[in-house]
A protein has these predicted regions:
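Glycine-rich dinucleotide-binding loop and its adjacent helix/turn
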Residues: 10, 14-35, 143-196, 290-292
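A Rossmann-like FAD-binding core segment of flavoenzymes
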Residues: 92-134, 139, 194-293, 332-339
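N-terminal FAD cofactor-binding segment of flavoenzymes
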Residues: 48, 52-60, 141, 154-157, ...
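FAD-site-proximal beta/loop scaffold in flavoenzymes
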Residues: 144, 149, 155-171, 260, ...
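Rossmann-like nucleotide/phosphate-binding core characteristic of flavoprotein oxidoreductases
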Residues: 1-37, 55-59, 249-251, 255-263, ...
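Conserved N-terminal Rossmann-fold NAD(P)-binding element of oxidoreductases
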Residues: 40-41, 139, 178-181
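Beta1-alpha1 glycine-rich phosphate/pyrophosphate-binding loop at the start
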Residues: 35-104, 187-213, 220, 228, ...
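Phosphate-coordination loops involved in phosphoryl transfer and adenosine-cofactor binding
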Residues: 32-36, 109, 173-175, 230, ...
Length: 339
């Protein structure tokens, strides 16, 4: 499918076309290009790792679907120390501007499709067939929205089921939407959507909201928001064209009801984007890549940083620090002759 929901640009469209129809044969068969460090992922951790590596005078490539990563789906950012207030898009633009001040090969609108360990070298194959080689690989592919995995959800993604309030919220102006999830991301989404939509209904699986009290207080002050706890979403219902309702079960009474609405924003957390690496490096049960205090994985020369790793607290500022740490660890291992 070439359907794109939300924001995009020509580079993303080109990448989709290359994936679906292939690329020029000479490009696919080109000689493997070698680097000192390859960074997979273009979020705060990936960009930080690339900049720190480049500042050491190393040959660096960064392979990313988009610079900014999950940050681009954040409306307001007020906890990035020394930057009192910014937006996800502004931060993503600033990350790219800073990155391009250094001689880094930016390979945007691509994904890492395959990783092979050949001696001390790591060979990377991208989604468009390019191959790259380096002794150090820093995985900073972040995390993705978790899905409900209920009947009807997959069918109506992009047709009423959404995950990014910032991207898709304006499409529901003046309409009734639901937010599934009562953590910080869910309540932030509800607050944001309340300024656009006629009504916002929040459904939380647990018996109480999990969001910070300051967010809950803000939510309670909004007249067009309704909250239901102990509520399980069991089905997404539509008319074949778009979503029309959710089936909700009260976990205390076991009673089910249909809630008619125009859209639902699923905000139940993130899942580590580690699937392509799981046969190479060790992961925990949720799929996060296991790392030590220096961002090293169980494979010499492979490091992980940010939301894809086991580092606690998935925050922008922490991801930036972890990316820097991974780069410094890789450089230290290089100097010591480990990689």
């Amino acid at each position: 499918k070439l359907l794109h929901v939300g924001r995009g640009d020509f580079g993303e469209l080109l990448a989709k076309l290359e994936e679906q129809y292939g690329i020029d044969e000479t490009k696919a068969n080109a000689e493997v290009k070698e680097y000192d460090v390859i960074v997979a992922g273009g979020g705060p951790a990936g960009v930080s790792a690339a900049i720190y590596s480049a500042r050491k005078g190393l040959r660096v490539a960064i392979v990313a679907e988009r610079i900014g990563g999950q940050v681009k789906e954040t409306v307001g950012i007020e906890n990035l120390i020394s930057v009192p207030e910014t937006t996800g898009n502004e931060l993503a633009d600033n990350l790219k501007t800073h990155l391009l001040r250094y001689p880094v090969d930016l390979l945007e609108h691509r994904k890492v499709e395959k990783v092979e360990v050949v001696g001390k070298q790591k060979q990377i194959t991208t989604s468009v067939g390019e191959k790259f080689l380096a002794p150090a690989l820093i995985i900073a592919t972040g995390a993705s929205w978790r899905k409900l995995n209920v009947p009807g959800e997959a069918e109506y993604i992009g047709r009423g089921v959404a995950f990014c309030p910032h991207c898709d919220g304006p499409f529901y102006k003046g309409k009734h939407v639901a937010v599934v999830g009562g953590g910080n991301s869910g309540i932030e989404a509800a607050i944001d959507l309340a300024g656009i939509c006629s009504k916002v209904t929040v459904f939380e699986f647990m018996d109480e909201l999990k969001a910070d009290s300051v967010l809950q207080d803000r939510l309670k002050s909004l007249p067009n928001v309704e909250v239901f706890v102990s509520s399980q979403t069991t089905e997404v219902i539509g008319n074949g064209d778009k979503l029309t309702a959710l089936r909700i079960k009260d976990r205390k009474t076991e009673e089910e009801r249909l809630v008619e609405l125009d859209g639902v924003f699923v905000q139940i957390g993130l899942s580590a984007n580690s699937s392509v690496f799981r046969d190479i490096v060790e992961t925990n049960r949720p799929g996060e890549i296991m790392i030590d205090a220096h961002c090293r994985t169980n494979v010499t020369g492979i490091y992980a940083a940010g939301d894809v790793s086991t580092v606690p607290y998935k925050q922008i500022i922490i991801s930036m620090g972890e990316g820097a740490k991974a780069a410094l660890s890789a450089f230290d291992d290089r100097v010591r002759g480990i990689i």
